Amino acid sequence: MEDKNSVIVFKNVSFQYQSDASFTLKDVSFNIPKGQWTSIVGHNGSGKSTIAKLMIGIEKVKSGEIFYNNQAITDDNFEKLRKDIGIVFQNPDNQFVGSIVKYDVAFGLENHAVPHDEMHRRVSEALKQVDMLERADYEPNALSGGQKQRVAIASVLALNPSVIILDEATSMLDPDARQNLLDLVRKVKSEHNITIISITHDLSEAMEADHVIVMNKGTVYKEGTATEIFDHAEELTRIGLDLPFPIKINQMLGHQTSFLTYEGLVDQL
């Protein structure tokens, strides 16, 4: 049966890095809702980053299936489907390949043989969307970490993806740069109806999401809306996750509902 509301579906997926090693993922099944922000959270070793690698084809499943827009991903169709998915990694320096900003954004377009005039238009539009057009001629060493991640997002946007994966993309940023990047991602999602998948150990980032998948020891531990997940905060701490500051304060105040944003915390106080 077709699932028109999901862009990516994992069905009974298991994976191990070596044939004699233990399984990193064990019979994992979940749906990524189309056009929403899904956050996949877990501590180190939970399997969340392996999920990202499987989504973009760095690794292949050992058993089970992955579907993209109701098509089972195979060796024959993967390259075509992969063009719809962009990814932003943890370290901005490791993904900056151009000598200046605009060349970095153009790199992926060149690989797809996009005509020069269209390439110029797409680069300018993408940089404008992330507020980096005025820095188009800057070298990477002239940019902050947050600005480099904005360029990485522009490089993805220029390729017109349907899905953007953020693989710990905010973990090396200071709090202000982190929040600015999350605000940008929310804006991009809204304006382009793009599906966002954030892979993170940071539960405060999951508070931004429409849908949350909690991984633990290679299995799906919990799944639901942010409110549903954080209303059972004690279960998150039980598997070694650190609760966001507003939720910790909310618990100290003795309130029954665990989910609380920073804005909500201010109202409470």
Curated annotation (Swiss-Prot):
Binding site for ATP: G42, H43, N44, G45, S46, G47, K48, S49
UniProt GO cellular component terms: ATP-binding cassette (ABC) transporter complex
E.C. code: 7.-.-.-
Compartment annotation: Cell membrane
Domain annotation ABC transporter: ranges: 8-242
CDD domains named among the record's database cross-references: ABC_cobalt_CbiO_domain1
Membrane topology: Peripheral membrane protein
Predominant location: membrane
GO molecular function: ATP binding; ATP hydrolysis activity; ATPase-coupled transmembrane transporter activity
Keyword vocabulary terms for this entry: ATP-binding, Cell membrane, Membrane, Nucleotide-binding, Translocase, Transport
Coiled coil ranges: none
Similarity comment: Belongs to the ABC transporter superfamily. Energy-coupling factor EcfA family.
The protein's assembly and partners: Forms a stable energy-coupling factor (ECF) transporter complex composed of 2 membrane-embedded substrate-binding proteins (S component), 2 ATP-binding proteins (A component) and 2 transmembrane proteins (T component).
Free-text function comment from the UniProt entry: ATP-binding (A) component of a common energy-coupling factor (ECF) ABC-transporter complex. Unlike classic ABC transporters this ECF transporter provides the energy necessary to transport a number of different substrates.
PANTHER family in alphabetical order: ENERGY-COUPLING FACTOR TRANSPORTER ATP-BINDING PROTEIN ECFA1, HEAVY METAL TRANSPORTER
Protein name as catalogued: Energy-coupling factor transporter ATP-binding protein EcfA1
Organism: Staphylococcus aureus (strain N315)
